[in-house]
Amino acid sequence: MNLFNKSCLLLIIISLNLSVTIAQSTKIISYNIRYANNTDKENNWNNRKDKIISLLKNNNPAILGIQEGLIQQIDYIDSCLSNYKYIGIGRDGKNKGEFSAIFYDSLKYNVIESNTFWLSNTPNKISKGWDAALNRICTYGLFENLKSHKKVWIFNTHFDHIGKIARKNSVQLILTKINEINTTNFPLILMGDLNLTPEEAPIQLLKSSLDDGLELSNTPLIGPKGTFNGFSLDEISKKIDYFFTKNLTILSYTHINDLEISKSHISDHLPIMIEIKF
């Protein structure tokens, strides 16, 4: 085989490998969309919702975890994203209060089982935990890829913004729940707004049991350093939104810069996204 033919063969092999990688990869977004607060003025949900939908459609995640979504927001997203379904309930066990809903592209994934627990000493009951200001929940499901039939557990949560003890104990509870639920050691993702910065002890506790998605990523962070913007146009440095994983390959990790589609932020958090292979 001459040099030209060898080079052509090598390019074909590389292209095929790249195609397989792309075909098997899955995009997952975690997004605190800022609850629909009637006292918000220019940042009112009605002024933001269509831009949020545009961002989601542009990035086309197979799985989408939402924090701070009230029922009217969840319903709106559900109505705009064709082929998507979701799991999750409100903090009251029905439709009131914040959801930690998980949307999924039903053409790509199926849900085998799902549930929600409360971040408290009585996780199976509607309850508020420790020094938390509000009831807090974690919604999870076992998702099956319809092509490969591979399965992955996904947990979505939003820790309390006031209770320091609650945040610490929420980590311990979730790790306990993961051990109880994931008895077959399937790949796993924990995502959400944890209201914790990377140096805080509860984050270190998570890292002792799960992989930090950013540290595991095959490529450097794409986008701003932080995730919380507070609707300010200043540099974003505060990181409180995360992906933690187990038994997964992270191809890329992104803090999506919403200013690329809008002159102002469309939530007080940036959406974060990973591309995974498993």
Summary of predicted features, one role per range:
Residues 26, 84-85, 109, 152, ...:
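A structural micro-motif
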Residues 26-33, 52-77, 103, 141, ...:
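Active-site beta-strand/loop signature of hydrolases that rely on acidic residues for catalysis
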Residues 30-50, 119-133, 160, 225-234:
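Acidic/histidine-rich helix-loop elements
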Residues 33-36, 70-73, 91-95, 108-109, ...:
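Solvent-exposed loop/turn segments at secondary-structure junctions
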Residues 41, 77, 84, 165-167, ...:
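Short, well-ordered secondary-structure micro-motifs
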Residues 165, 169, 176-188, 196-278:
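Metal-dependent phosphoester-hydrolase catalytic domains
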